[in-house]
């Protein structure tokens, strides 16, 4: 029984195996059910006890040597496969790197921050309020009686639930409720803007069910339309970064201001030269609203204005369709990065 030859043959066969499949086939020749060493182990039963003990020990040593050679070759093949994969996935550190994509503000948020910065620079505070508003703050406090058309389901999103007095809750239709909320917590002189999201049942190229608005309020003992025109004209020139802007006031109607006016602007030069563009609603704060602020309308007077942040953004960047701001198309948004 030439065990040394069997071990040598096994080691040579294993070493010559180029892959795991071939190696397993070679293993069967020596360690399988009909393998050389297996057959020798089966034949031990025919030997006398003393010889069986001696030969059994020799066969087990040979088997251990074959298994050691088998495991060594398995590890070598596994290492070779790993090295091959690593080589295929290797990164050439000498290649130029790829620039990471940098995020940027949404164009409407750029406008939001710019509006805040400009009004802060001319002495206005910035306030924020709840988007789910009470019926009283959204309508009644702003001189909109209970039968006002704006309260209908066609224009306002009502939500489940009531306020502490049992009145309906709604998604605010403007940021104007902050006029009353802020004035009740601060004494005149009051100069504040309130940017924020608002909601109305409306959707087309120039309207969205959700849009952003900035409300402005100035309350003091001697405030006039001249102050409104001066402050808003100064804002427009800083926002659009140009001085060739004309501003006009057109009579209008808003329940919370009297008199009321639409604010139009016109560029004297450039693409939109000579065109009056509607930019904001405004007016002198209605005495009823001042009274609801907890102030004496015989003593205090002021003005308010409301501008759509999407509208300002559209005019600044020449965007024609409001809906583009909400479609999250990176091809569109990257233009403002």
From Swiss-Prot:
Query: What Gene Ontology terms for biological process does this UniProt record contain?
Result: phenylalanyl-tRNA aminoacylation
Task: State where the protein is found.
Answer: Cytoplasm
- Keywords attached to this entry: Aminoacyl-tRNA synthetase, ATP-binding, Cytoplasm, Ligase, Magnesium, Metal-binding, Nucleotide-binding, Protein biosynthesis
What is the similarity comment for this entry? Belongs to the class-II aminoacyl-tRNA synthetase family. Phe-tRNA synthetase alpha subunit type 1 subfamily.
Provide the binding site for Mg(2+): 258
The identity of this protein, by name, is Phenylalanine--tRNA ligase alpha subunit
Q: Cofactor note, please?
A: Binds 2 magnesium ions per tetramer.
Gene Ontology CC, one term: cytoplasm
The record's listing under PANTHER family reads: PHENYLALANINE--TRNA LIGASE, MITOCHONDRIAL, PHENYLALANYL-TRNA SYNTHETASE
Q: Which SUPFAM superfamilies match?
A: Class II aaRS and biotin synthetases, tRNA-binding arm
Known partners and oligomeric status: Tetramer of two alpha and two beta subunits.
- Name the coenzymes or cofactors required: Mg(2+)
EC number(s) given by UniProt: 6.1.1.20
What are the recorded GO MF terms, alphabetically?
A: ATP binding; magnesium ion binding; phenylalanine-tRNA ligase activity; tRNA binding
**Protein biosynthesis among the record's keywords?**
yes
A Pfam family that this protein carries is Phe_tRNA-synt_N
Reaction equation(s) it catalyzes: tRNA(Phe) + L-phenylalanine + ATP = L-phenylalanyl-tRNA(Phe) + AMP + diphosphate + H(+)
